[in-house]
Amino acid sequence: MTEQNQQPKTYCGFIAIVGRPNVGKSTLLNKILGQKISITSRKAQTTRHRIVGIHTEDQYQAIYVDTPGLHIEEKRAINRLMNRAASSAIGDVDLIIFVVEGTKWTDDDEMVLNKLRSAKAPVVLAINKVDNIKEKDELLPHITELSQKFDFAEILPISAQRGKNVHILQKIVRKSLREGVHHFPEEYVTDRSQRFMASEIIREKLMRFTGEELPYSVTVEIEQFKLNERGTYEINGLILVEREGQKKMVIGAKGQKIKTIGMEARADMERLFDNKVHLELWVKVKAGWADDERALRSLGYMDE
C-alpha cells in the first residue's frame, strides 16, 4: 500500500463532565460543541439526563457525558436517580473534567471529589467563572490549596460563558483520546432524538421564565412530534407540575407566561431543527411524580 492510500489515524474517547449543581457544566459543554445541546439556566439541578455531546474535529472525536450535578441530599426518588446517573458516568471514561466555581469550595464539591478518588481516569480540574472573581489575587492561593487535595492531571481556570481557556481544555481532551474508530458520523453533535431535545428546550424556558419560583420537580412530556403535509413539525408538549399553585405560576396572568415560554421554545427549536415548528403547550398537575420511581420510569428518567 502506498503512503498516499493510507488512512490517517483516528482517535476517539469518552469524557465525563462532573461537578455539583450550577457550576456551569452545561454551559461548558455547549461552548465546546458550538451550539446548545444541554439545558442551561441559573437554577440548580436543570440537567436531568446524561446528555451525550459529540465533538468531531479532523481525526479526533470526543464524546462528552454531561452528568446531573452530584449533590448530597437524596431524599426524593429523582435526586437518588440523578446521583446514580452522575456516578455511573465516571465509571468508564478516558478523562474526567471536574468543574468547580471560582474560589468557592462547598461540602458538595468535597463529596464529588471523594467520588472521584476511586476513578481510574485522569481528572482535570476546571475552575469556572473566574471572570466573576472580584479579588483576583485570591485565585492563585485557591489553586494551590486545591492542588493539595488531589493529584489532578491539570488545573485550569476557565470561563465557559466567555470561552476563556476552553480551547486549552479541548487540547487536553485531545491528548486523552485513544487511537480508534469514531463512534458517530462527523456531523453528529448529540445522540439524543429531536423529540428529547424539544422537551429539554421547553424545560429550559420554564426554568428561565419562572426564576426561583418553580421547583426543579417539573418535567415536560412530548405527546406528539410529527411532520405535517406542509413540512412543519407539529409538537405538543405536556408540562407536569406537582401542585395547582405551580400550574398557575407556569400559565401566568392571562396566560402570558406560558405564551412567552412557548414563543421562546419554538424559536430555539426552529434554529436547532432548521425547520418550521408549530408548538402547543398544556400544563397538568401530577402530584408526587418526583417521589415515585414508577412515574420516573414512565417519563424516561430511568432505564427499565
Swiss-Prot record:
Paired cysteines (S-S): none
A single GO BP: ribosomal small subunit assembly
Region (G1): 19-26
Top-level taxon of origin: Bacteria
One example GO MF annotation: small ribosomal subunit rRNA binding
Membrane topology recorded in Swiss-Prot or TrEMBL: Peripheral membrane protein
One GO term describing the cellular component: cytosol
UniProt keywords, alphabetically: Cell inner membrane, Cell membrane, Cytoplasm, GTP-binding, Membrane, Nucleotide-binding, Ribosome biogenesis, RNA-binding, rRNA-binding
Domain Era-type G: 11-179
KH type-2 domain sequence ranges: 210-287
Keyword Ribonucleoprotein: no
PANTHER family attached to this UniProt entry: GTPASE ERA, GTPASE ERA, MITOCHONDRIAL
Matching NCBIfam families: era, PRK00089.1, small_GTP
Free-text function comment from the UniProt entry: An essential GTPase that binds both GDP and GTP, with rapid nucleotide exchange. Plays a role in 16S rRNA processing and 30S ribosomal subunit biogenesis and possibly also in cell cycle regulation and energy metabolism.
Family membership: Belongs to the TRAFAC class TrmE-Era-EngA-EngB-Septin-like GTPase superfamily. Era GTPase family.
Stated name of the protein: GTPase Era
Gene: era
